[in-house]
Amino acid sequence: MKLYCLSGHPTLPCNVLKFKSTTIMLDCGLDMTSTLNFLPLPLVQSPRLSNLPGWSLKDGNAFLDKELKECSGHVFVDSVPEFCLPETELIDLSTVDVILISNYHCMMALPYITEHTGFTGTVYATEPTVQIGRLLMEELVNFIERVPKAQSASLWKNKDIQRLLPSPLKDAVEVSTWRRCYTMQEVNSALSKIQLVGYSQKIELFGAVQVTPLSSGYALGSSNWIIQSHYEKVSYVSGSSLLTTHPQPMDQASLKNSDVLVLTGLTQIPTANPDGMVGEFCSNLALTVRNGGNVLVPCYPSGVIYDLLECLYQYIDSAGLSSVPLYFISPVANSSLEFSQIFAEWLCHNKQSKVYLPEPPFPHAELIQTNKLKHYPSIHGDFSNDFRQPCVVFTGHPSLRFGDVVHFMELWGKSSLNTVIFTEPDFSYLEALAPYQPLAMKCIYCPIDTRLNFIQVSKLLKEVQPLHVVCPEQYTQPPPAQSHRMDLMIDCQPPAMSYRRAEVLALPFKRRYEKIEIMPELADSLVPMEIKPGISLATVSAVLHTKDNKHLLQPPPRPAQPTSGKKRKRVSDDVPDCKVLKPLLSGSIPVEQFVQTLEKHGFSDIKVEDTAKGHIVLLQEAETLIQIEEDSTHIICDNDEMLRVRLRDLVLKFLQKF
């Protein structure tokens, strides 16, 4: 069993598991942190960005000044943002049989894999994962395509040139694999390969293994996966949460008795308490609005935004902010808000029960009805007419490199009355803000990440007790900025096996058993013999028939009856006869009793020597020795067949035949 690690990002995993002749891809996350190296794509022409100076090498050579621009001491690529793809050279991706998706954030690289690698298999995911994943992809494509940029930068990617660049461009990894965004046509083609599954649904893969999705408690429809055969079990835990938010709670019990547990997608902010962050978010938002400023919340169109809107619903009246408009701007805003209300079966029990009252599961429905929350596809059109300040705007993209958020950063960045509040943990907020410097607006970092922290993981591993844990190397050592915090790493016994991008891991257990069915007529013919009290054995002579990874023992063919005529035999009739098997022997030879038996049968001058594996009985007069070991007995004599047979018969008296 092998694990191929195609992604270096611990919360955006992409691994391939080879297990019992099946090749299974576990997630296909897309590392978007590469976009932080690019200039933002403004919806409205930005003189500030257009007039940034080009960057030159230290020797004054300016051949890169069209590709690289400098802003407040940072250097950025002036081109359409590109994404860091999973490894495509480590394994032939056309051999992948299935792709298992754990949540909608971990499927963003799907079109690159299904459309450009020769992949012909099936993708499995829950319905909310597919529908919300579609929204995320649609929003991403829309953000990139609505701001066309003719210029394409590639000179800086040359290895000899890249090492001359300042950080972080100099340190960027795998830049040759970075690619532009896919198209909606590729998105639709990729999604057409997905087969919808429900929690606890068992899916057979070629008769070899069975895969089952379990609720992971992190997002709508998010899953952990069990991959098992009759005698082996692998658990894949990715993006899980034990906090009570809007999704169904995590199914922990089904993870027990795993041979291997692959662990990814832990919290990116292990020292931040989500509840505390939500409190800070609300108080900073209220403070800004009371002072006449606007609040910008860069976010994804699904996930944490539902919880933030629910908190604001409970908070704004008590804080005296009921007249402050909330705007949600995204090409998929309407679809996202509607989907959150119709996926009732995937919600926690508390929200499920509201559906039957009838009451909307999420309070943002009431915010929309009372005109406190308004949603728009973009800043153009109706939004321009309705827009009033001070206000709170939820919009994307959290990287601040594309989407409507770029417009608001340019619009509000010059005033210290305004505040941008970062709640998504996927991007460094300092790097996200770099191309907007100098910046007057206040910046608040309230990362809300409900995924498992290290304390919760340690407790979980003690409860489910897998034989082996496999995880990204980032989880086996403290964060570089907090090297003294030994509590910010996985602590388990035996120690976790770690992996990094482009590594192949041989998983530390071997398959020992295979399930075989036996036909009734063959079973009827068996005659078990008791070799120990309560233990019986029977020899089986049979034909092993294997098809679709299922094995069947059939009765051996009967010997062909001789025919009198000269009729030609058909090829199919020419079945080889089964050989007559020698009886199997069982038992042990007690040395003292064996020596006594030899003496009774006329052997003298017998000497016994102990060895590491058993005993040697020397018959010095006959120049013969008998090696008695745990699993074999050898009679060594010099060309005296009669003596060997005589000794063999004496040995057989101590063994059972069957």
Curated annotation (Swiss-Prot):
One of its GO terms (biological process) is regulation of transcription elongation by RNA polymerase II. Keywords: Cytoplasm, Isopeptide bond, Nucleus, Ubl conjugation. It is found in: Nucleus; Cytoplasm. InterPro entries: Beta_Casp, Integrator_9su, IntS9-like_C, Metallo-B-lactamas, RibonucZ/Hydroxyglut_hydro. Changing residue 283 to R: Decreased interaction with INTS11 and BRAT1. Its main location: nucleus. Although strongly related to RNA-specific endonuclease proteins, it lacks the HXHXDH motif that binds zinc and participates in the catalytic center. Its function as endonuclease is therefore unsure. This is Integrator complex subunit 9. The gene is INTS9.
